[in-house]
Amino acid sequence: MKLRTNAGPLQGTIQVPGDKSISHRAVILGAVAKGETRVKGLLKGEDVLSTIQAFRNLGVRIEEKDDQLVIEGQGFQGLTAPCQTLNMGNSGTSMRLIAGLLAGQPFSVKMIGDESLSKRPMDRIVYPLKQMGVEISGETDRQFPPLQLQGNRNLQPITYTLPISSAQVKSAILLAALQAKGTTQVVEKEITRNHTEEMIQQFGGRLIVDGKRITLVGPQQLTAQEITVPGDISSAAFWLVAGLIIPGSELLLKNVGVNPTRTGILEVVEKMGAQIVYEDMNKKEQVTSIRVVYSHLKGTIISGGLIPRLIDELPIIALLATQAQGTTCIKDAQELRVKETDRIQVVTDILNSMGANIKATADGMIIKGPTVLYGANTSTYGDHRIGMMTAIAALLVKQGQVHLDKEEAIMTSYPTFFKDLERLCHD
């Protein structure tokens, strides 16, 4: 598709879709809680729909009623063996978390994904789940999908130190631990997003978080809840950056989730000189509205414990850095290389093809700015965040056209992205 270029100031108010991480977990925990769970504000992107379909195939009744998702949970004993392969589409979250959940079930399943997911390593969940007594395997020593899993009703608790910073691996182990008899401990390298821990507690589960150590004694039963999903900060990040780098812009991003394990991008842009104001902050619910205006920015260093708190926002932060004065250095982000694409290389290649000055490193990027961006032929390579980054970059282009292939990938997390973009350009 041909992207909009040479945009004037962006003006208006936007409500971004529901948080993807919370939406997945609401469905997963609701499916094994006892009773009727209702979810408002659920993200209806393709990844979450993959999770919903998986649980329907596992015998859980899930319906939409009055703009809410209603899940008839039957407890951990209520799942039934699927009659077919579970297709997780493009969703690594679905595959890893559901594998953890099914670890304690007395049946076997085969889990597959699309071409992109089939290139993402699952060894990170295979090894701890095997230690708990699950028969699970993928392709080659990296354990690529498809995954074959035989659950075990007599799971063993483990103490596991994560070799990488991954909320998905942590979550897979905790979901298995809810069904294991005894004390499971997970020790993180760096603190990652904690939605699973918070939502297990919201559903009546018990665990202890002590710094980087999470302790859970199983088995436990969960109780149905009413969940309201906040706006996704990872989706809001695209408008946040657009407002900061397009001259004359002023945007209000409504009801954005600001869980502290996800707000690294806000800290980074403020350090770079961004003018942002928080309105209607609800600290208990961890939700706020964010007013953003065009700002003159300077380069910065992004590394260490900050990386897990903004890992999904790094592509759009890289674009931001191309418009900042000076050098921005991103380090310790090698996890980007095993996302939907090798995001370090793909971001570097796309933005450099548009005139940016970026050097890819083993674990990040060195970005020199500011640079003028020009038209180019690009692709999402099947990665939703790459597609949205490119669409925001195109708004800065004054010379040439920007063509984007495989734009349908954006449906993964933000089905109304282009509709919202057009509205902000016309408000």
From Swiss-Prot:
Does the UniProt entry include the keyword Amino-acid biosynthesis?
yes
Q: What name appears for this protein in its UniProt entry?
A: 3-phosphoshikimate 1-carboxyvinyltransferase
Q: Which residues bind 3-phosphoshikimate?
A: K20, S21, R25, S166, Q168, D312, K339
The record's section on InterPro entries has: Enolpyruvate_Tfrase_dom, Enolpyruvate_Tfrase_sf, EPSP_synthase, EPSP_synthase_CS, RNA3'P_cycl/enolpyr_Trfase_a/b
Name of a matching Pfam family: EPSP_synthase
Q: What is its EC number?
A: 2.5.1.19
Relate the protein's function as given in its record. Catalyzes the transfer of the enolpyruvyl moiety of phosphoenolpyruvate (PEP) to the 5-hydroxyl of shikimate-3-phosphate (S3P) to produce enolpyruvyl shikimate-3-phosphate and inorganic phosphate.
UniProt-annotated catalytic positions: D312
